[in-house]
Amino acid sequence: IDECKELTGEEREVMKAEARFLRAYYYFNLFKQYGPIYLWYDQIADLAIKSEVIDRNTVDECVGFIEKEMYDAAQILPKTIQDPTTWMGRMTKGAALGMRSRVLLFAARPLFNGGGSIGYGRGMVNHEGKPIFPQGEDLNKWTKAAEAAKMVIDLDVYKLHFNKTETDPVLKAMNSYREVFTEKWNEELIIARYYKDGEVWNQRVVPPRVFGVGLGGYTPTMKLVDAYPMMASGRYPVTGYKADGSPIIDDKSGYEANGFTDGWLHPTHRDKGIKVHNSMKGRDGRFYASIFFNGMYWIHPDGTKEQYAPVTFFTGGTSSYAHSSGDYVKTGFVFTKFTDPNIDTRKNTWGSFTWSYLRLA
């Protein structure tokens, strides 16, 4: 790259820093997938080398190399993108420091920090008999992770995104969260990919057979649905599961595990009541921005008499299993997290969305 004279010296240095960060990022992905790995450092990888000749580096060596590479890249990368129309999405100082904080947080958790109560990894050694995993917990790793996160906050570049029009607390919370993924390059995003054509996601979450265009293929599990807290109490309603799979309920959360309510008004369509299982009521605004459940209406924004399309997933329902098609919702839920409510999915218009790899929240 130093031979590319069409670039300024500063541009060349930034590109080198981008490459250094991306190399560290992909090392981190390998580390998450496989645990401690072999580090080539600045050597050119020998593709012909035999795996039995090389050995894994230790957890601390992997983490130390990755986080230092990210920190060093951050010293050169720009604080903000000066030409966002052309270059938004390229790496910045905040991207490198933010991902570094995630690396350090990952390394501080018990799995890679002493192995917790079961001592995971303590018996693993390399060919030389050197332990690959830390042999005890180091509480300073949590401090280092917190300090790394504070460095990102102190850049004063990123802010939590808030909806600017709603006054109702539930709607404000719901739309603030939703807009993080539907408003292009909003102030909360640190590393993201913008999808101009939202079909890659939205068609696959629209309930099938209601409009003839949905596939209903991406569905949340019951455990994910249970993971959202209650709006009023802020408590998590399900704290675990019994041996038979039934949930353990926090009685102080305000959660109702049984029964149905007729005429309940969902935050997104308050002028049209629905019959709802009581467990769907009173949840955090992020729940209603993310989870579409049985009995809800899929809303079209054009104001016609067909604006509200009822969706039911049970046998014989409007979006139930059909023998002629493999497209059906197995869990009774679909996602609405990345779907802009202003798009009309009946017309094969899928809008856009942002996939966040790292954000301030």
Predicted regions mapped to residue ranges:
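An aromatic- and glycine-enriched ligand-binding surface/loop that stacks and positions planar moieties
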Residues: 37, 41, 93-94, 104-316
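TPR/Sel1-like alpha-solenoid repeat signature
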Residues: 20, 97-103, 360
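Glycan-recognition/cleft segments
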Residues: 316-328
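Short glycine/serine- and small hydrophobic-enriched flexible loop segments
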Residues: 2, 28-32, 99-109
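Extracytoplasmic/secreted envelope proteins and their assembly/folding machinery
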Residues: 16, 63, 67-70, 97, ...
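Conserved, well-structured interaction surfaces
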Residues: 1-34, 49-93, 256-259, 276, ...
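Short linear capping/connector segments at secondary-structure termini
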Residues: 42-49
